């Protein structure tokens, strides 16, 4: 494989592509340029979710970093498959465990992972594929809306509101923006992790359909 540089471009319409928990879940922005931001962590999460949904039960396409995963348990799978004691990780066990994890987990051989845990140590993997933050082409304006819910959570809330049973909330969206992120694939690291041409095609498919299964009230168009 040769080195690949690529761009991921997507647009956002009346959606919040990546809320900032430090700012009340408002869309992330660069405080100097006021351009919208989507973190690389957010983009990788969507790629992982797509692979997990579309490659379920396909050998070699398991996902290491997934919701509610217990990472030690995932690494114990490697030790058990190789006949090692997870409580006695040595250099031999670590190196063999790292290769097993790369072979079986798509996101490890793609993005890398730190697996240097005390138990079932599988070392570290530097991934061949790296993504930048996505940044909007122009500065964005965050629209804020007040929303109401015609119900309350507890009887006490109902009593406090004298039966009105309404709760208020806020919702933030980006009216419209085009975002772009830069990425690269390092062929030398790909050789080390076993990242293949087929893996690259799978990654491209995931990026093309990044938001297909990501629609929600905050992202009605999936973006």
Spans of model-derived segments:
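RNA-binding basic/glycine-rich loop and surface signature characteristic of RAMP-family CRISPR effectors
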Residues: 1-223
């Amino acid at each position: 494989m040769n080195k690949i540089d690529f761009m991921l471009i997507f647009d956002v319409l009346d959606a919040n592509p990546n809320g900032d928990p430090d700012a009340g879940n408002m869309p992330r922005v660069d405080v100097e340029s006021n351009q919208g931001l989507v973190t690389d962590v957010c983009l990788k999460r969507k790629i992982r979710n797509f692979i997990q949904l579309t490659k379920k039960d396909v050998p070699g396409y398991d996902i290491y970093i997934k919701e509610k995963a217990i990472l030690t348990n995932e690494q114990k799978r490697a030790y058990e498959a190789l006949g090692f004691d997870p409580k006695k990780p040595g250099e031999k066990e670590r190196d063999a465990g790292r290769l097993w994890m790369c072979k079986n987990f798509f996101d490890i051989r793609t993005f890398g992972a730190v697996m240097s845990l005390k138990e079932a140590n599988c070392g570290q993997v530097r991934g061949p594929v790296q993504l930048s933050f996505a940044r909007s082409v122009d500065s964005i304006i965050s629209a804020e809306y007040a929303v109401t819910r015609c119900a309350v959570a507890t009887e006490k809330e109902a009593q406090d509101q004298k039966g009105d049973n309404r709760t208020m909330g806020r919702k933030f969206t980006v009216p419209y923006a085009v975002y772009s992120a830069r990425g690269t694939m390092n062929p030398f690291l790909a050789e080390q992790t076993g990242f293949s041409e087929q893996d690259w095609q799978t990654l491209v498919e995931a990026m093309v359909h990044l938001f297909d299964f990501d629609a929600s009230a905050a992202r009605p168009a999936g973006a």
